Amino acid sequence: MDRPAREHLKFSKANTKNEIREMRIYKDDTADGLCFSEINVGCTSTTPKMSLSDYFSSVSCSFDGEMRIPDIPLKMYGDLHFHEQFTNDVDLDLLCWQLLSSNQDSRALCVNILRMVTSLSLGNAFISEGRYHYAIDTTEQTSAEDSDALRFLARIAKIVIKNDVDKSDVVAAQQTLIYYYFGNSYQGIHLNWDSKSSQQSIHGYSTSEVCLDHYIRMKVDLFHGLRSKNLVYGGNYQLVYQALFYYYVITNGRFSSGFNVRKDSIKSYFVPNDDPSMCNVSPRKPSLSLMFIRAVLITILIKDYSPVKEIPKYLRQLEVENPLTNSCLITDNGLRSEVPMNAAAPSAPTPTELPVFSPPSS
């Protein structure tokens, strides 16, 4: 059985944690002795051909002191809508990857996300099996899980468009990500990537984000991760969430490179980082808002495999929009009941100064 055929069978994905223990192991055709679920992370002629676990074998992490659990700010913009509809079909998994990727035009992408919300609310689009389809007056139904996942994406899209995030917001989001990933709240972490690992010398790899970018884009169902609980990737699902966390750190963390700044030589990263100019990304340097929403997005993706049992704040309160009337309600603490955003909000805000709505008091 060839790799593409196996990739979509039940052997390469398990639906529950219990199935992992009984899952059959299939060898990857591209390298002897590698489990299929680890895959080969080499994506260019200059990147290593090794399994994901080997790629992570030389990574060490050290921690700064413990701290109180950070309070990530809840940002909502109830009057920010785009009335134009999005008329193309799109793979939402690819859309999520573009939001995470360091070399995508994320701001333009965020406008399209809000256009999708408008189309969906007008009954001119639906989401099925992770794809957005535009269809005027469609009778197809979109599940609540798909709708909530798109609402979450719309929330972070508004944050990118508004671009009023400050450095303290970014630090809080990154420390929250650390808290969810490790289960303890630390002031910061240092990620060190030692290229002098036990692998053969021909593997002389660096921490270039290209390998993890390729792995996440090709192998991880990001949108399904947003909408589905207990989505498990093969027998080594921990590596998927490790890859997501490392990818954020090496693309949005502060790097140190020793004597030169060649990307190939970068070995050490630190988060929290509140300086976009110090991020290891190319060709576009991220803004503070992109650093913020990517930390929130990764936190949501790893939530079901985190030792932290609390539901992240950005999933507890989702905006329910009606672009036709420029109105917006929110779900209260994850319940389906809807609460007005802010009864005292001005009815006609100026175009240059959109109000920031606060969540209702509990």
Swiss-Prot record:
Segments of this protein annotated with the region Disordered: 341-362
Name recorded for this polypeptide: Probable non-structural 41.0 kDa protein
Top-rank taxon: Viruses
